[in-house]
């Protein structure tokens, strides 16, 4: 990917993320025209029409208010991910946004699909990838199985960000914290994982600078150490 990547802990399409999303839109080169934004509710594809429709509507309203031309695409399963009617819209996008839901489902739906390949062509030309929650998790090396509290059942993810796991909602208490603790104990010495608090984003590019934006913090964890970074801080991702 050549465009920016935004790993978002929560808050997609809400006013709390306006500053982050304005930054992402300003980073693209739209040649003086309104940037094209594609909103993908793929991670909610198993939740029914009401949920999918909500994400499509919220994405359209949010980015229209920020001055973009918005294309909410109902790519919700493998058939729609391979539908050629969406290819050109994805290829011409300046920003592609994956909202939250089921990380395993969105990865398995998009992997090797025409939609994913078209999105990659857009990113290679400078488009932004923004992923919230599940949309952020699929860029790490692996996605854990939350149903088993992180004990087995992991699947490979796209591995675009060199973190073993990208964990959104990091400041959220409860069973989620148990999963994080299990995964951390299983890291190898050379591995790290990223935790992204709610209403917070980590924005950057692989091999370049990554900066915290938003309300709270980003956390870099190894098996033996943990470091937290506030908004404006640079996170030293290898």
What are these regions (language model features)?
Residues 99, 105-175:
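Class I SAM-dependent methyltransferase SAM-binding "motif I" and its flanking Rossmann-like core
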Residues 1, 33, 91-92, 125:
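Residue-level preference for short coil/turn positions at secondary-structure junctions
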Residues 7, 71-72, 97-98, 129-132, ...:
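General beta-strand structural signal in soluble alpha/beta enzymes
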Residues 44-100, 105:
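Portal/gating segments that form or line small-molecule/metal binding sites
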Residues 1-33, 43-57, 61-64, 143-145, ...:
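C-terminal and late-domain segments of enzyme folds
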Residues 37, 96, 133, 166, ...:
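A residue-level signal for conserved active-site and pocket-lining positions in enzyme catalytic cores
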């Amino acid at each position: 990917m050549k465009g920016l990547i935004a790993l978002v802990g929560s808050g997609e399409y809400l006013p709390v993320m306006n500053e982050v999303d304005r930054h992402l839109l300003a980073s693209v080169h739209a040649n003086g025209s309104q940037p094209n934004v594609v909103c993908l509710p793929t991670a909610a594809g198993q939740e029914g029409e009401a949920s999918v429709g909500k994400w499509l509507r919220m994405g359209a309203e949010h980015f229209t208010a920020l001055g973009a031309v918005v294309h909410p695409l109902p790519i919700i399963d493998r058939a729609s991910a391979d539908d050629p009617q969406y290819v050109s819209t994805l290829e011409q996008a300046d920003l592609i946004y994956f909202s939250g839901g089921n990380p395993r489902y969105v990865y398995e739906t998009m992997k090797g699909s025409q939609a994913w390949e078209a999105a990659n062509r857009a990113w290679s030309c400078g488009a932004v990838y923004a992923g919230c929650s599940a949309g952020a998790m699929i860029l790490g090396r692996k996605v854990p199985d939350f149903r088993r509290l992180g004990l087995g059942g992991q699947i490979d993810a796209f591995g675009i960000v060199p973190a073993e796991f990208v964990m959104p909602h990091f400041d959220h208490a409860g069973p989620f914290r148990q999963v994080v603790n299990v995964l951390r104990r299983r890291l190898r010495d050379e591995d790290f994982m990223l935790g992204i608090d709610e209403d917070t984003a980590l924005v950057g590019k692989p091999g370049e600078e990554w900066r915290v934006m938003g309300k709270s913090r980003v956390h870099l964890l190894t098996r033996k150490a943990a470091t937290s970074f506030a908004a404006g801080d640079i996170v030293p991702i290898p």
